[in-house]
């Protein structure tokens, strides 16, 4: 049962609990604490309620349901599964069909996050069948939505093992994603008929994300546009921010970079309004990469510099390293080779501290090429900036890599290359992670794409700088070389 449904049951059954008033009072306090966000304390009260005991099976079922929900939110999925199974057993014992449907749905959601997709699908299908038999359209809508989520999650997990762009997954992954689309579409149609705008928006968001993974970017844009419109209509700023970000991602893959930039700018403004520093940094990173695709390297450099500053404030060393890598590339494209060399060395240092062998190799390659361009020995060290955020920072061992680093939230990874023709730019597009309406942050697939992009592009970076280093004689230092601040 949901928390609200459990509360109704607990209150209604108060008179039928002979000698069980203490159980009921403890359970209601546990529910209050869970609603207030203190699930750990709520669990303690629910456990005490069970110790107090009750002969009323509906009250006990409600306690099991809420314990399952509380453990789910605490991340203890094994215990959540245990209590949802107990709730399901009691519902069947009482021949409570609606309770059985809700317990099946809760169990399905728990099994989904545990990666037990086949079992989750069976539970969610039971939820759907019972809801339809009862004619409960709201419960049917939840079941359809949950089934879509299970197939979507299964497809994403299967897709992690490969290194494929959206639209180029193996057939088993596509099959899962297409099943997700089918259930989301049924849910969307039902929610529209019920006039539930919030649920309609969620369905559109998930349909947009799934179509994105299937490579149907035009369709993804249609759904995310509707998601954006509904979010604005109901005043859901967080959903509006997600929709803009997802629209930017989809426009990137269609080569519509100006449109992408506008959506990322809106994402940035909303992130600032919401006080979400990590997403604000993500948006700066996305804008830097988008302006690289537009070959507006000065603007790209400005956004990457903002990303670097944000990464340092967040103590996100992974994000800081990526920002240095991007800044080095942007400055190289602008011909600011000394600044590019400084950031390449910063990238190498951070990669070394993180144990990122691929990052070290990329940085070392760039350092070598830039030293050749500048006529410097490879082991020369450029002067460090002294008057900005590039000054000494907290030692690495005092920092923690954030669980949701900007790169794990990231959008695209591009190597600037001013020598390329416009027709080649689309080949630079890399994996863009579509944000889930559920708030999940699947990151491994994106990082693999970035690593593959970096590895395959090393030779291209070398070729560009080698061209600049051919028989024109030794390059002179720029007029700004006396200024040590990049």
Predicted regions and their residues:
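Long, low-complexity intrinsically disordered regulatory regions
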Residues: 1-17, 167, 181, 378-443, ...
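Eukaryotic all-alpha helical interaction scaffolds
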Residues: 51-53, 71, 91, 131, ...
């Amino acid at each position: 049962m949901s928390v609200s449904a459990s509360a109704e049951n607990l209150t209604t059954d108060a008179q039928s609990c002979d000698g069980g008033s203490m159980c009921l009072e403890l359970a209601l306090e546990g529910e209050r604490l869970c609603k207030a966000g203190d699930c750990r304390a709520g669990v303690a009260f629910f456990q005490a309620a069970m110790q107090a005991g009750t002969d009323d099976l509906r009250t006990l079922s409600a306690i099991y349901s809420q314990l399952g929900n509380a453990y789910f939110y605490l991340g203890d999925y094994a215990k959540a599964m245990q209590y949802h199974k107990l709730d399901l057993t009691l519902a069947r014992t009482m021949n409570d069909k609606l309770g059985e449907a809700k317990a099946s749905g809760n169990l399905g959601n728990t099994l989904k996050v545990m990666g037990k997709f086949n079992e989750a699908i069976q539970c969610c299908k039971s939820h759907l069948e019972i809801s339809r038999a009862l004619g409960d359209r709201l419960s049917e809508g939840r079941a359809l939505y949950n089934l879509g989520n299970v197939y979507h999650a299964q497809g994403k997990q299967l897709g992690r093992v490969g290194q494929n762009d959206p639209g180029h997954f193996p057939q088993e992954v596509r099959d899962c994603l297409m099943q997700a689309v089918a259930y989301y579409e049924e849910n969307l149609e039902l929610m529209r008929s019920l006039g539930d705008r919030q649920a309609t928006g969620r369905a559109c968001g998930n349909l947009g994300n799934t179509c994105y993974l299937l490579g149907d970017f035009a369709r993804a844009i249609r759904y995310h546009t509707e998601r954006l419109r509904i979010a604005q209509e109901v005043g859901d700023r967080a959903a509006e921010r997600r929709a803009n970000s997802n629209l930017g991602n989809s426009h990137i893959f269609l080569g519509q970079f100006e449109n992408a930039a506008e959506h990322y700018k809106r994402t940035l403004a909303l992130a600032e309004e919401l006080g979400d520093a990590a997403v604000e940094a993500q948006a700066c990173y996305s804008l830097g990469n988008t302006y690289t695709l537009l070959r507006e390297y000065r603007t790209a450099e400005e956004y990457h510099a903002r990303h670097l500053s944000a990464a340092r404030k967040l103590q996100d060393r992974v994000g800081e390293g990526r920002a240095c890598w991007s800044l080095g590339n942007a400055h190289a494209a602008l011909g600011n080779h000394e600044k590019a060399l400084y950031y390449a060395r910063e990238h190498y240092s951070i990669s070394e501290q993180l144990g990122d062998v691929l990052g070290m190799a990329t940085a070392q390659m760039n350092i070598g090429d830039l030293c050749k361009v500048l006529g410097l020995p490879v082991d020369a060290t450029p002067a460090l900036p002294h008057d900005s955020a590039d000054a000494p920072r907290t030692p690495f061992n005092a920092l923690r890599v954030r669980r949701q680093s900007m790169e794990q939230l990231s959008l695209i990874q591009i190597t600037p290359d001013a020598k390329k023709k416009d027709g080649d730019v689309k080949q630079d597009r890399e994996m863009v992670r579509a944000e889930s309406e559920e708030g999940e942050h699947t990151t491994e697939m994106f990082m693999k794409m970035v690593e593959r992009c970096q590895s395959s592009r090393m030779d291209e970076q070398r070729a560009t700088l080698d061209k600049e280093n051919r028989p024109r004689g030794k390059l002179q230092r720029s007029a700004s070389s006396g200024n040590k601040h990049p």
